[in-house]
Amino acid sequence: MSLDSGKATLSEVYRMGVLILIRHGQSVWNAENRFTGWTDVDLSERGVGEAERAGDILSEIRFGVVHTSGLIRAQKTAEIIMSRNNVSGKIPVMKDQRLNERHYGDLQGLNKAETAEKHGAEQVHIWRRSFDVPPPGGESLKMNAERTIPYFEEEIVPDLKDGKNVLVSAHGNSLRSIVMHIESISPEEIVSLEIATGTPMFYKYDMESGELTRE
């Protein structure tokens, strides 16, 4: 599903059983090229604009529930999106730390380029992109997936089974874990998946088979 799809088309197609995943809009530390992790930084001006554009794209989808993390950048992205929604009305917003970004441990707050100069680009690449090697004091993608995927199965899938359209506003690595699970992507392949800020991803839920299909 392209981002420039007409609103009427989205409204007609996604009446029920759709999952929308979105990484929060650009944060202040994204703009400064810093490791963020669980540090609770706000959206940048660009990030607010990204959330507004996503809200316009999704404005005719009747959502039944929003799931988001415990961090303000994801929560605010969801708030902005829903403030531009024309059809959903007041809906529950579920906030849970299991959808948080990977914890980057000792790297949180550090500039990525400066960290690469200090520790070597190869080591920093391993910390950032390997599946099971955590940064010092932090989480690997594998550890992130071990909390994110159970949340997805226990809290999000039941909403889809109930016929709800579901918005999940979260983070690059928590969403990477969910996409890996949905699309059966291997650990070797998932580390190269890039998820852009503020860009909705559409999945259609089949009520009979329980399968999710990328649109």
Language model feature labels by segment:
Residues 208-215:
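Short, well-ordered strand-loop elements centered on a beta-strand within folded domains, enriched
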Residues 20, 26-80, 84, 134-150, ...:
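Loop-to-helix element that buttresses phosphate recognition and phosphoryl-transfer chemistry
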Residues 24, 171:
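Histidine-centered divalent metal-coordination motifs
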Residues 4-7, 13-14, 52-125, 154, ...:
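Phosphate-coordination/substrate-recognition cap region in phosphate-metabolizing enzymes
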Residues 149-156, 160:
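A short, acidic, amphipathic alpha-helical segment used as a generic capping/interface helix at domain edges
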Residues 19, 163-169:
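Residue-level preference for the first positions of well-ordered beta-strands
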Residues 172-176, 212:
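GST superfamily/GST-like fold recognition
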